[in-house]
């Protein structure tokens, strides 16, 4: 029996959120709400709402992924609390 049959599955996310997540995974620098909205052919208010919701959910769940807004835009980062593990992994080259 999997989580879907036991009723413990996470709710499905919207296509808009899925697309925002995918874009944020591949950016080299923060993406502005305006740039995301243009790429997604969406209103900036919709994109902004998706970003804030995702940011809150990641924080609430204690995710190792931190979605941060900088003056340049939005980007995924690793949580500061996990810096030692990330640093060890990067330095060891594993």
What residue spans do the PLM features occupy?
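Phosphate-centric recognition/catalysis
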Residues: 1-16
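Pre-recognition alpha-helix immediately N-terminal to the DNA-recognition helix
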Residues: 18-22
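Short capping segments at the starts of secondary-structure elements
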Residues: 26-32
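A short acidic, leucine-rich amphipathic alpha-helix
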Residues: 32-39
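Short, charge-patterned binding micro-sites
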Residues: 39-41, 73
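Short amphipathic alpha-helical interaction segments
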Residues: 43-53
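Short basic alpha-helical hairpin corresponding to helix-turn-helix/winged-helix-like nucleic-acid-binding
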Residues: 54-94
